[in-house]
């Protein structure tokens, strides 16, 4: 993300701060020594796998599945999962919590604010069609602040 010129440095810093504040154990340290021993189709992705190994992660959630082949990740008991599949699985496990999280997320969006329909349309554009197919019938349950 740091090399993505469409994202302003301030936005990246805001996301980093929010992740660190709200996601327990979101910062993994001490993984650097693992990087050189890893082989992935894109060498610039090795730090992601190294952090997953160091952090004892079971899953790497990424749109970039081609650069995280499960055949290679299997040796580390890690799997790569598309965000649409990951979110859909979470919904199947606990739909109520996912609806609550969606509601909190929608209500946190202020500039511009989103209706439930606009929010779901945005998720659809972000390549999350299966997840949206679960949420759309429940959109009337999403209360806006």
Language model features: what each stretch is:
Residues 1-31, 105-127:
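PIN-domain endoribonuclease scaffold, especially VapC-family toxins
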Residues 14-20, 35, 55, 68-69, ...:
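Short, functional N-terminal and low-complexity linear motifs
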Residues 24-59, 93-94, 113, 126-145:
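Active-site neighborhoods of divalent-metal-dependent phosphate/nucleic-acid chemistry enzymes
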Residues 45-79:
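Acidic, metal-binding active-site segment of PIN/NYN-like and related structure-specific nucleases
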Residues 65-145:
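Acidic, PIN/NYN-like endoribonuclease modules and their adjacent C-terminal/linker elements
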């Amino acid at each position: 993300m740091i090399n993505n010129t469409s994202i302003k440095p301030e936005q990246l810093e805001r996301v980093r701060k929010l992740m660190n504040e709200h996601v327990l154990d979101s910062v993994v340290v001490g993984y650097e020594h693992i990087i050189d021993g890893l082989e992935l189709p894109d060498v610039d992705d090795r730090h992601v796998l190294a952090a997953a190994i160091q952090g004892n992660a079971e899953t790497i959630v990424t749109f970039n599945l081609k650069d995280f082949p499960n055949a290679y990740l299997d040796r580390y008991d890690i799997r790569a999962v598309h965000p649409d599949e990951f979110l859909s699985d979470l919904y199947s496990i606990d739909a109520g919590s996912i609806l609550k999280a969606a509601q909190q997320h929608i209500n946190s969006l202020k500039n511009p604010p989103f209706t439930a329909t606009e929010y779901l349309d945005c998720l659809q554009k972000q390549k999350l069609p299966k997840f949206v197919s679960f949420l759309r019938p429940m959109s009337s349950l999403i209360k806006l602040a």
